[in-house]
Structures are given as structure tokens and as C-alpha cells.
Amino acid sequence: MLILVSPAKTLDFEQPPLTQVYSQPDFLTHSQELIQVCRQLTPSDIATLMKVSDKIAGLNAARFGQWQPDFSLDNAKQAIFAFRGDVYTGFDADTLSEDEIAQTQSQLRILSGLYGLLRPLDLIMPYRLEMGTALSNPKGKNLYEFWGDTLTQAVNEALAESGSDIIVNLASNEYFKAIKPKKLQGQLISPVFKDCKNGQYKVISFFAKRARGMMARYIITNKVNTLAELRAFNLAGYYYSEEQSSPTNPTFLRAEQ
């Protein structure tokens, strides 16, 4: 199985990584193009474009200015250990074994507005550039037009290397929109996680993000290869609901927390 996840806004470049092993992102020339565009933006432009505070806009203007493509462990960090959002809390990369880190490197891919498609051990420098950002660039009016078919092709290549024909989409809609589903050369499965609230089951963003991270970790740790094994996911009180599921959207429910 090849697993797709989103990145996170929250970053940690303070804690040392779990391993000294790293790889370099595949699309750094693309990243450099975007950085050149972003460097032309003032902090005020960034605040408006990204809908962030002046403080965060200033921080990201500085990040764009400092960014350079010669990554090492002295100035960058592996993506899986740098991202610290709800998905990554659920994934809990800091407790991976060496074998699991290696497995994650071959099975997990992180969609990114700036870096395109990251392997877990790819080095990144701090940034904020969400995939849905309407950033005009030489290839179009937003990042979806900038990346075009590039990321879909990269996913197909990663899928072929994995030896599987199943893609488990645990990314948000914003990020998965950078992929062209009809051009994928495998079976696309997009799990859904619903929590009970006031007697009704619904997707609650905070819980669903954590569940997506937990499922990604579950696939790695348990060496899940089949859809039947995927449906056995039962962490944190979630259970598979055949009634609410469709062939491409296995749905997992959880009682009110």
C-alpha cells in the first residue's frame, strides 16, 4: 500500500531527529521557482494571501528569504520529524523503530505546496505554503496549476516501486486536489472517520486528522497489505462500519468521547 498524507502548519526544528539517515526532495528545482515568486511578496502581501497575522506573515517572509536548496542536517530536518500537527500526533513518528522508519520511507508520501511530494526522510527547511494558496506563478494562477500532473506521475512511480496497487488517501481534500484520480494507476481508497456527537455520526476535523495519522501508523506497524487488513483498524475506539462504507470509502465509527 502507498499512503498519502497532508503536511502540517505546526513545525518542530528544535528537537533532534530520531535518525541521522535522510534523503533529498525530488522537486527542489520546482521549490526554487516557488521561492523566487514568494520572495517578491511583502509581509503585507503574505498576510492577505495566506490569511495569517502580521507576525506569522513576517516569519514566513523571513523563511522565504533564508531558504536555499543545499539541505543538510545542520539547516534542515527530515519531514516526518519536522511536521507536528494532529495527523503527526496520531502517527507518532518519534516511536518508530529503525525497520519501521525504513518501511515508512517506501510506503508513505507527504503532499506539500512547496515541496510537491515528500518521502518521510526528505530534508525540508521551515516553510508555510498551503496547497490551496492562490499564488500566481509562471505556470498558472495557483499551486494546483503549478504542479499540474507532476505529483500524480510521482505517486504512480512510488506506487510501482512499492509493489502494490492500492493507494490509501489519508490526505485532506485541499491537498488531494493536487492529484488527478483518473490518471492514477492503482486502486484509490479514501477512508472516512466519523465520531458520534449528540447521537449522530459526523466527521469532526480534529478527531479525523488524528485518526488519519493513526491509520497511517497502523498500516506501517502491522504491515497491512490488503483491504481486509485495513478494515481491521481498531485504534482509539474506532471500528469498521460496513453499513456506512462504500467500496472506495471504508468508514470507521467511534462512540461519543
From Swiss-Prot:
Pfam families according to UniProt: H2O2_YaaD
Show the InterPro entries listed in the entry. YaaA (IPR005583)
Q: Name one GO cellular component term.
A: cytosol
What are its GO biological-process terms? response to hydroperoxide
Q: According to its UniProt record, which protein family does this protein belong to?
A: Belongs to the UPF0246 family.
Name this protein carries in UniProt: UPF0246 protein Sbal195_1149
Organism annotation = Shewanella baltica (strain OS195)
